[in-house]
Each structure stands twice: as C-alpha cells, then as structure tokens.
Amino acid sequence: MTGAKRKKKSMLWSKMHTPQCEDIIQWCRRRLPILDWAPHYNLKENLLPDTVSGIMLAVQQVTQGLAFAVLSSVHPVFGLYGSLFPAIIYAIFGMGHHVATGTFALTSLISANAVERIVPQNMQNLTTQSNTSVLGLSDFEMQRIHVAAAVSFLGGVIQVAMFVLQLGSATFVVTEPVISAMTTGAATHVVTSQVKYLLGMKMPYISGPLGFFYIYAYVFENIKSVRLEALLLSLLSIVVLVLVKELNEQFKRKIKVVLPVDLVLIIAASFACYCTNMENTYGLEVVGHIPQGIPSPRAPPMNILSAVITEAFGVALVGYVASLALAQGSAKKFKYSIDDNQEFLAHGLSNIVSSFFFCIPSAAAMGRTAGLYSTGAKTQVACLISCIFVLIVIYAIGPLLYWLPMCVLASIIVVGLKGMLIQFRDLKKYWNVDKIDWGIWVSTYVFTICFAANVGLLFGVVCTIAIVIGRFPRAMTVSIKNMKEMEFKVKTEMDSETLQQVKIISINNPLVFLNAKKFYTDLMNMIQKENACNQPLDDISKCEQNTLLNSLSNGNCNEEASQSCPNEKCYLILDCSGFTFFDYSGVSMLVEVYMDCKGRSVDVLLAHCTASLIKAMTYYGNLDSEKPIFFESVSAAISHIHSNKNLSKLSDHSEV
C-alpha cells in the first residue's frame, strides 16, 4: 500500500514538474518576442511604411556608425558592423517596436576610455604598420578594436547577469530627471570630444576627472593651430544640416519622404574633397580606407577583461538606461507594453554576439528612434530592412567614403545630438513642478560633466534614493482606501442615483516615482473590486453596476457599456487630503489617470488639493479650464456633480 502511494505521489510530482508543450511555447514567445509579432505581421498595411522607414534608418545607421566608431577611437569600418549585428539581435529578442539599436554616442565615449588607456596613440609607432592582418588594417587598429570588443562582450555579460537576477524591476529608481540630466551631460561630453575635428586641430586624448575643462583649456592655449578650412567646412555643414532638418520637420506632414541630408552631405563633401584634393592641399583629415566585406567571427581577447571592467559596467548601465527610456517612451506612445527584464536580455545578447564580429558597444539612440517615429515605422521589420542596406554599403559602397572629411563627420555627430542637448529645456518644467527634481537634474548634470556618464548616473540614483528616504518617514500612511463614510454622510442629501455613479477614493500617501505605477494599479483594482463586491444586484441594475467598472478597466467592455448606457455619466472623486508631497513622476501619473478616465467618459474630480499640486497639474497637463476639477472638499465635488445632474435633466426636459 505504501509502495502504491509512493508510486502515485512520484507520478504526480513528475507530472507537476514536467514542462508541457504549451509552457515551452509560451516561454519561447516570452523570450523571443519576434515569434509573437512576426506571424501576425500585416504585409499589406505595414510593409510599405516599414520599407520607407528602413531606408531612412539605414542612412542614419551608416553615418552614425562611421562617426561613433571614430568617437570610440577605432577605425570607422567597425562602426558599420556595429550598425548591422546589434540591430538584428535586438529585432529577435527586443520588445520595443520602434527602438533602433546600433552604435551609440554615450557607449562609444565610454569604450574610448578603455581603448585609449590600453592601446594609446603613441603605440602606433611601436606596432607593425603592415596590412597583413584582418581586413587589411594595421595591427594597431586591430588591437584597438579588440579592446572595444572586449568592453562590448563584458558589458553584455553584465546585462545578461542582470536579466538572470531580474534586476529590471529595480530600474524605477532611475527617474526621468536623472536620465535626462545624464544623457544631456554625456551629449555635452561627446560634442567636446569632436572639437578637435571641427577645428582641424591635432590634440592628444584627454580624459579623466575634469577632462571636459582640460580639453577647452588646451584648445584656447593652441588656438593658433586651428585650420580655417576645417572650421569653415564644419560651420557650413552644421548650418546645412540644421536648416534642412528643420525644414523636414516643418513639412513632414506634406511630404511622405524627407530629404536624407546626412547622406547628401557625405556624398557632396566626399566628391568635393576628391576633386580638390583637400587632404594634401589644405591638410584636412579624411576617413581613409574602408575595407570591403565582413571578417570571420573571432572571440574578443579574454585576457584583458579585468582591465576593462569599469568601462564595461558603464556601458551596461548607461546603454541600458538610455535604451529602456526610449523603449518605454515608444511603448507609451503606441499603446503596447514592454518587459524591463527582457530588455536586459535583448541588449546583453546584442553586445555579446556583436563582439565576435568586431563591433563596438551598442544601444538604442534617440535620433534613430525619433526617425522611426517620423517616418511611420510599424515594427522591427524597418530595422531589419535597414540592415540590408547597411550590408550593401559594407560590400559595395564603403570604399567610396575614403575622401569624407573628418570635420564633416564630426558635424553630423554634433547635429545628431540635438535631441539630447535641447533637454536643457526640461529645467523649466522641473522647476515649476518640483524644485527638488530640478536640483537633482542640475547636480547630476554637473557630476556627469566633471567625471563621466556612469558616475553621473550613479550619483543621480543615490541622490534620488537619499531624498526619498529622507522624505518618506514624514508621510502619515502609504495606503489607498475607499472613503465609505463620506458616501453615507451625503447619501441623505443627494439622491441614490447620483451616488451610484460616483466612486470616492482617498489617497493618503505621497505620490512619487517609487509608488506612481502602484498607485495607478491599486486605483484600478480598487474600483473593480468595489464594483464587483459592494453593489447589490437587486438594488442596482446591471448596467448601473458595471458602467464605472467598464469605463475604467482596460478590458474590451468599453463599447458595450457605452452602447447599453449611452446617457450614463460616471464620476471619480480623488480625495487628496493625504498628499504630503509629490514629484514629477507622481504628477505625471495623476495627469495620466485624469486623461485615461476622460478618454473613457469618466470625469475625475480632485478634492482637498494644495496650491502647489493644482499649479503642478495645471502646468504639466494643460488641463481644460472650462470644467472645474479642483474642489475644496469632497462634499463640494459631490454638490457639483448633483447640480450637473439637475442641469442635464432640465435640458433633457426642455428638448422634449
């Protein structure tokens, strides 16, 4: 009998722990998102916009690949490889439909520190200059790309390790002000690194703490060595790029295909340099020989991994944070969801696999992602199509870029960073919404400028956590509860029909980046629970019971509810008397709740609001001033609802 029980228990245990076919399929779809969206790809609707976007993206990938490779202190051809392989890997494993992965200015700048430290410029004279190595490049160039590939490999390993540890759920501590300040500071560093090319100067590599200021000190000390030809060509290139891009932005609704000014400028500058022999006549530095084809894969040198661990951590964190911000932005814009942990895996594998093909560290770039928005891309097919055109450049067009002046390439980098640099304008909104966030932005930017992007990011996160820890003990409670007593208090004064369509929620906790998402989830869960449990079916019709629930839930019941009860008006009153403080993320989530409910025909009224909260919400959300939404008390809000009900009834009778 005991043996039979053991056998039965063993069979039950093995059945519970044996993976079913459906579980394996579900796991594959979760870890390979391409299996989820590719079978449902609509060729008729999506292929044309994805193709157009892919062609435009390829232009950006090629130009930025060449430029960011130089920024990473390696030969430009390796930037072309970095524009190809990471995009393919991310299209398979990534969840962002509009995220363009490839070379990235910030990760290139970080990896350049390792390249210049381990293989400095003065080693060029000590290594053989023969072209017998891979791709026909010198041993010096190959040593440099080996270091950059090692940074990419180790950075990818760190990202995959963070995926295994499920650290994606901890990324909420990296707030929007910290990301904005870090990327703006890093973009300022990138512009500074291009000054020597813009001015045509010969300058030693300068890095380390306060290196930003040492570069400008060197420029002013050697101002006489500036090449006027390079300066004029740089200014002309920047003016042309800015003007044409602004015109493209102004007329993008009228013209379906914008002018690829980066590509036109590269062709024109290369042709002019070739015809006038600027390299020898004026001493302009050019890109030089671009090898054809893709070399056989080779593992990065493992013996130098310990020497690049600092840069690898910087690449892993900075690249992931910047990419995740873009992925979350696109998901919010186009109404889909992403998994923060899956993004760790996607970017980690992009860096690991690409490092075997002589690629520099990769991440998503703001300019390329914005380009996908503007050209109407639908899916990652646009990125895969761009890879086809990058391959054409690698195998056919690459050698024609020999005569491209470096000052023109630097101009393309500087103008391409415009989206990051104009984030200085965020200072105004942070000042108006929350001055502490303004202080975090400024201090994070200063630390990034004085040290590096990874140091600035770390400082911003630590500073944010310290401030929240210091503020949270002052909060009275961290719970959200239904304010039933207020319902009973006003029930004798107002008719029951009014109260059936009103839900009163009391928020008795601070609303900051730590709990903004949970606030939204708890709010919706509470509304669903209260509508499901607390309203008796025999007292209220089924339509009345579910109207507010259907309006606020994310299910597919909205149309049905609106059809069955077209004249019902629902109200949600948020009692904000428990607000002790808030930040930019909290105000953003509160405005999002207001907008979501408004889109579902639910009026949101806020009671007991402080003057600072009213000012912040009005400034952030551009709220409709014609309808009052802020009230001194919950009773005042309910009285407002009751008067509106009476007015609507009077208007209905008058129409009859």
From Swiss-Prot:
Keywords: Anion exchange, Cell membrane, Disease variant, Endosome, Ion transport, Membrane, Transmembrane, Transmembrane helix, Transport. Gene3D superfamilies: STAS domain (3.30.750.24). Residues 492-641 form the STAS domain. PROSITE patterns: STAS (PS50801). Signal peptide: none annotated. GO terms for biological process: bicarbonate transport; chloride transmembrane transport; chloride transport; gastric acid secretion; gluconate transmembrane transport; iodide transport; monoatomic ion transport; nitrate transmembrane transport. Residues 641-656 are annotated as: Membrane targeting. One of its GO terms (cellular component) is basolateral plasma membrane. The chain crosses the membrane at residues 76-96, 145-165, 167-187, 203-223, 228-248, 255-275, 307-327, 344-364, 384-404, 405-425, 449-469. Its main location: membrane. Induction: Up-regulated by hyperosmolarity and down-regulated by acidic pH. It is a multi-pass membrane protein. The keyword DNA-binding does not apply. Residues 97-144, 188-202, 249-254, 328-343, 426-448 are extracellular. InterPro entries: SLC26A/SulP_dom (IPR011547), SLC26A/SulP_fam (IPR001902), STAS_dom (IPR002645), STAS_dom_sf (IPR036513). One of its GO terms (molecular function) is oxalate transmembrane transporter activity. Residues 1-75, 166, 224-227, 276-306, 365-383, 470-656 are cytoplasmic. It is found in: Basolateral cell membrane; Recycling endosome membrane; Apical cell membrane; Lateral cell membrane. It catalyses: chloride(in) = chloride(out); iodide(out) = iodide(in); bromide(in) = bromide(out); oxalate(in) = oxalate(out). Belongs to the SLC26A/SulP transporter (TC 2.A.53) family. It is linked to Disease-causing variants in SLC26A7 have been found in patients with thyroid dyshormonogenesis and congenital goitrous hypothyroidism. Acts as an anion channel mediating the transport of chloride, sulfate and oxalate ions. Mediates the transport of bromide, iodide, nitrate, gluconate, thiocyanate and bicarbonate ions. Its permeability towards bicarbonate is weak and increases when pH is above 7. Mediates thiocyanate transport in retinal pigment epithelium cells. Mediates iodide transport in the thyroid gland, playing an important role in the synthesis of thyroid hormones and the maintenance of thyroid function. This is Anion exchange transporter.
